Amino acid sequence: MRIDVLTLFPEMFSIFNHSIIGRAIEKEILKINTVNIRDYTIDKHKKVDDYPYGGGAGMVMSVQPIVDSIKAVKKENKGKVIFLGPKGKTFNQNLAKELAKEEELIFLCGHYEGIDERAYEYIDMEISLGDFVLTGGEMACIPIVDSICRLVDGVLGSSESYEDESFYNGLLEYPQYTRPAIYEGKSVPEVLLSGHHENIKKWRKAKSLIITDKVRPDLFKKYKLTEEDKKILKDFNKKL
């Protein structure tokens, strides 16, 4: 997958040179480029923003450098142009799965009080991270790109690495434990030490269902319980 990020602060994306995403870039599974929007302004002072027509607080990103940077990137990247903004669809795991199927994507990070409305003609999709205010689009772009990239084939060791994670199947993840088996009198659940893979699988599914119901009832309501799920919960509750 190729991703180009249009931003005023390209240095913020150096985080992708590390850990799982960094290794995927080294293996050429991913290619993440940053493009400085400021490089495309025709203003002699390198300005990329101006006062809003009609008055108001703050500054607005100018249409010219935004559009010219999009056009330049589009010569090599034919993917959707995604703007990180408050009017967009709220990002979630399902949207991450859909975007992970794309071969190319372009992200546009806004700043200041927003972008000139005329730039929207060059934008295919707007995504919001949530109902809260951030300093700039970069803050939203980083977790969104990370979430998408980890679902690209080959980025993680195996599909099991992300299929068991919270949200992937509509549920929160089960509890995790590592050594020591006993710490300050608190023991790891016996089933996890048993080596019985089927029982471990059922325990994890039961805990995942119970935790989701308790912590995120909104997610649990959307989840469709199978007959196997119901049996796992029934058997789990009998052992309590």
From Swiss-Prot:
It is an enzyme of class 2 (transferase). One of its GO terms (biological process) is tRNA N1-guanine methylation. S-adenosyl-L-methionine binds at G110, L129, G130, D131, F132, V133, L134. Keywords: Cytoplasm, Methyltransferase, S-adenosyl-L-methionine, Transferase, tRNA processing. GO terms for molecular function: tRNA (guanine(37)-N1)-methyltransferase activity. It is found in: Cytoplasm. Gene3D superfamilies: 3.40.1280.10, tRNA(m1g37)methyltransferase, domain 2. The keyword Ribonucleoprotein does not apply. The keyword Cytoplasm applies. This is tRNA (guanine-N(1)-)-methyltransferase. It comes from Clostridium botulinum (strain Hall / ATCC 3502 / NCTC 13319 / Type A).
